[in-house]
Curated annotation (Swiss-Prot):
PANTHER family: PTHR37478, UPF0251 PROTEIN TK0562. It comes from the Archaea. Pfam families: DUF134. Belongs to the UPF0251 family. The lineage of its organism: Archaea, Methanobacteriati, Methanobacteriota, Methanomada group, Methanococci. This is UPF0251 protein MJ1243. InterPro entries: RNA_pol_sigma_r3/r4-like, UPF0251, WH-like_DNA-bd_sf. It comes from Methanocaldococcus jannaschii (strain ATCC 43067 / DSM 2661 / JAL-1 / JCM 10045 / NBRC 100440) (Methanococcus jannaschii).
C-alpha cells in the first residue's frame, strides 16, 4: 500500500537528547505506562518553553511553519502533562528530524565549538 499525501519534511534540531527516558522515582520502567515524546516535539518545547524563543523564531530554526511548530508544542505539552499527572514514564524517540550542521546549532552560536562532530574531525 503506498503512502499518500505530502512527504514529511525533516525538522532541524540542534543535538540529540542527552537522556531518552524519564520515569517516576522508585518504580521500575516495566511497571509504569509510557508516553512517547518525539525528538522534534522535545526540540519545539526546548526552544519555546525553555529558551524563550518566539514561535516564529523557533519555527525558522527548525525549518518548519508556525502551524507545524504549534502542533508539535501542543502534542508535546499534552504528553508531558499526562506523564506528570498520571505517573507515566516519558520515552523520547522517533520523529522526523535532522541534526543541524555546525554553524547553525545553538552551542556553536554561543561560541562552544568543540562539541561538534565535524569540528572534532578537523583536528
Amino acid at each position: 500500500m503506498s503512502r499518500r499525501g505530502r512527504p514529511k519534511i525533516p525538522r532541524f534540531i540542534s543535538e540529540e537528547p542527552k537522556f531518552r527516558i524519564f520515569k517516576p522515582h522508585g518504580v521500575s520502567l516495566t511497571e509504569v505506562d509510557k508516553v512517547i515524546l518525539s525528538v522534534d516535539e522535545l526540540e519545539a518545547i526546548r526552544l519555546v518553553d525553555y529558551l524563550d524563543y518566539t514561535q516564529e523564531e523557533a519555527s525558522k530554526l527548525m525549518g518548519i511553519s508556525r502551524r507545524v511548530l504549534w502542533s508539535l508544542l501542543t502534542e508535546g505539552r499534552k504528553k508531558i502533562a499526562d506523564a506528570l499527572i498520571n505517573g507515566k514514564a516519558i520515552v523520547i524517540e522517533g520523529g522526523e528530524y535532522k541534526i543541524r550542521e555546525c554553524g547553525f546549532c545553538m552551542r556553536h552560536r554561543f561560541g562552544i565549538k568543540k562539541h561538534c562532530r565535524t569540528w572534532r574531525e578537523e583536528l
